């Protein structure tokens, strides 16, 4: 399924709680604008918080924002900044769609959903089911979180090298554009 011809999609993972005016929301909004300005289409879960903010930023910058929503949340309204909504049945189908159609992944601060999304992509990278799709973890909390995971789970040291890290959204987009063209 072609989402929008001529665009590569970046899936952005992040929490559903940040509201407009809060730092995390504003950073996600900036990320969406930077990705759109660089020529990328933005994909997210399509609802509130970081998902809304990244869609808002992309849409206000003239870009494309795709929300991959879920039938199990039919009572929730998708955010108003989406160029297109793609409805999936549940979390599993949403993640399948995002991992199949995104050509890169950026993870911001979030909760269990963000950790699940990041972990799935990480596992797919580790097992070789995702190739040439970079994942950038944004924020200074990721390294200590991953060090804690390394101390408690059985994970090979080289698997921690599958990520790219960025302290800011500006750095994340600069890193992405240096290794990954927005054009297919």
What are the residue ranges of the model-derived segments?
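Short, acidic/small-residue loops that bind anionic groups at enzyme active sites
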Residues: 64-71, 108, 122-148, 157-158
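Acidic/glycine-enriched connector segments
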Residues: 26, 49-109
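Short, conserved catalytic or adaptor-binding loops enriched in Gly and charged residues
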Residues: 77-81, 152-158
